[in-house]
Structure formats: structure tokens, C-alpha cells
Amino acid sequence: MKKKIAVLLGGNSSERKISIKSGYAILQSLLRSGFNAYAIDTRDFPIMQLKKQGFDSAYIALHGTGGEDGSIQGILEYLNIPYTGSGIMSSAISLDKWRTKLLWKSLSLRVLPDIYLQKKDISKYTYSYILKKILKLKFPVVIKPNNAGSSIGITIVNHPDLLIDSINLAFNYSNNIIIEKFLKGTEYTVSILNKKVLPPIKIITKNNFYDYSSKYIESSTEYICPSGLNYQKEEELKKIVEIAWNSLGCKGCGRIDAILDNKDKFWLLEINTIPGMTHRSLVPMAAKSIGISFDELILKILKINK
């Protein structure tokens, strides 16, 4: 008898739409491969009923809060249902950008200087206090939600007059935010499949950075794979990514973003433990560059689930 697989998608996070696209692409792939798979929107389905409904395994296609933060992983472990991707602790830390950076920094991996602000303490911060901190970083800065993905709620701020609106925007998506030094450089993303680091992809966008529009809307964004890095530099980047990935105890499939500055140094940006699987997604592109089709990729991820 075939195993009954729940493709968990949708949810309540700000990345719901992308999750649905990813989830249905995964579902169709599993069906093509002959699996007994079903789409389960965690916003509407009582997740504690998965076992009673006969599901044997879960393929997590949820993005952001409720999917990448360890909560769904905890429920699945309680239900004793195997699932794809990283475990509870790795997921929780990885979605927390600030704590991820603290860990990477402790390993002497380059991360950009930042300021961490919590919504519950915002009344303690005066405008002059925040501005004084930012002036140490120097403008421009990037203001981003601490616990959100897909570049949602992120703005680049070049002038003090734009600070308050940008901070409030970021707080709409997370109770904690990061104000980070903006670094102009060449962006790369590196995918990991099980313990294998896939070829880096160079990202060229006409926008100031690789934002939501660049990822999901703009057709002008270019993805270069092979990346154009020389062998030594590419191996350096892959090694940095491998260390960063393993430090968090991640498993399965993921992606880490980095930027190369004008002094030829790589800086880590952030990690994605449940990367998108849409037609514009980068993990399938990296896999394809070494001969792994989309359906083969989905099967490989399924086979290394917990």
C-alpha cells in the first residue's frame, strides 16, 4: 500500500501565496512520480488530525512563521509523522536572522554589522537613540523583519527622514527587526541538498537589492549558473556555506545567500531552510545545472526526510 503524503502549504504567514505556489508544484511532482499525495492548507486543516486521516509522511512547503520556525516540526514530531527538512531547533534558529548571525559571527564567518530592536521595547527607544546607533553604521542601511522571508517588509534607507516609516513597516511583519549596514556588491545564492553544496547562482537585479519584486515579479532579474566565479573563489564560497549550514544543524534542502564586496570578500546574508519551489525558484535551477530534474529533486528531498 502506498504511503499517504501530506504536502503542507499555505498557512497564515506573509509568505502564504508563495507557499501555495511551491506546494502545488511539489504536489504535482509527487503525483507524476506515482505517490499518494494531497495538498493540506494548514490555515484550514486541523493539523492534529493528520495521523487520524491516515497520513504517513509530510512534505513541508510552508514558508515563514508557522512553517520554518520549528512549530510545525514540533507538531509532526509529537504525531510521530516523518517530515522533510530541518528539525525543530535548526528551524527555529534559522528563521531568527539575528541569532543566526550571532552564531555565524562566533565562527568567524563574515556578517554585516546591525542593530536589533524589539517591538515590546520600542517605547524605550527615542528617535535620537536609534539615529545615533545608525550613524555608527552609516547610511544607507537595510531595515528588515527579523522573522520573515521572501524579502517582505524590507527597505533600504538613505536618509533619517525615512527611518520611522521603514521601522514601522518592518514591525508589521515581525515583533523584532534588524537595522543592518547596506553593502553594495554582487549577490550569490547557494543551495544545499542533503550534505551536497550545489553550484552557486549569481543574481543580477536592476533594483537596489534582491527584493520581493526581483524574486517573484520582475522578469528582468538575471540568474547566472554557472556563476562566473573562478574555481578558487567558488570553492571558497561553497566552503563558507557548508560551515554556515552545518553550524545550524540543518538537514534536507536549503539555501544560503551571500554577497561579494569590492574587496573580494564574501559576507553571509541569511539562510532559507524551506526554499521556494516555484518556476522562478533557485534550488531547482542549481539542481538542474548538475543534471537533477525537478521531479528527481523532489524525490531526493522526500527520501532524506526525518
Swiss-Prot record:
Which GO annotations describe the biological process of this protein? cell wall organization; peptidoglycan biosynthetic process; regulation of cell shape
Q: Which cofactors does this protein require?
A: Mg(2+); Mn(2+)
| The species this protein was found in | Buchnera aphidicola subsp. Schizaphis graminum (strain Sg)
Q: Which UniProt keywords apply?
A: ATP-binding, Cell shape, Cell wall biogenesis/degradation, Cytoplasm, Ligase, Magnesium, Manganese, Metal-binding, Nucleotide-binding, Peptidoglycan synthesis
Q: What is this protein called?
A: D-alanine--D-alanine ligase
The record, for SUPFAM superfamilies, names: Glutathione synthetase ATP-binding domain-like, PreATP-grasp domain
Query: What gene, per UniProt, encodes this protein?
Result: ddl
Which HAMAP family did the record assign?
Answer: Dala_Dala_lig
Q: Which residues form the ATP-grasp domain?
A: 101-303
What EC number(s) would the UniProt record show? 6.3.2.4
Q: Which residues bind Mg(2+) 1?
A: 257, 270
Question: What does the note under cofactor report?
Answer: Binds 2 magnesium or manganese ions per subunit.
Q: Which reaction does it catalyse?
A: 2 D-alanine + ATP = D-alanyl-D-alanine + ADP + phosphate + H(+)
What functional role does this protein have? Answer: Cell wall formation.
Q: Which Pfam families match?
A: Dala_Dala_lig_C, Dala_Dala_lig_N
- Which one of the record's GO molecular function terms can you name? ATP binding
Which residues are recorded as binding Mg(2+) 2? 270, 272
Q: Which residues participate directly in catalysis?
A: 15, 150, 281
Q: Which PANTHER family match?
A: D-ALANINE--D-ALANINE LIGASE, D-ALANINE--D-ALANINE LIGASE B
Tell me the route in metabolism or biology where this protein functions: Cell wall biogenesis; peptidoglycan biosynthesis
Any idea where this protein resides? Answer: Cytoplasm
Give the family from UniProt: Belongs to the D-alanine--D-alanine ligase family.
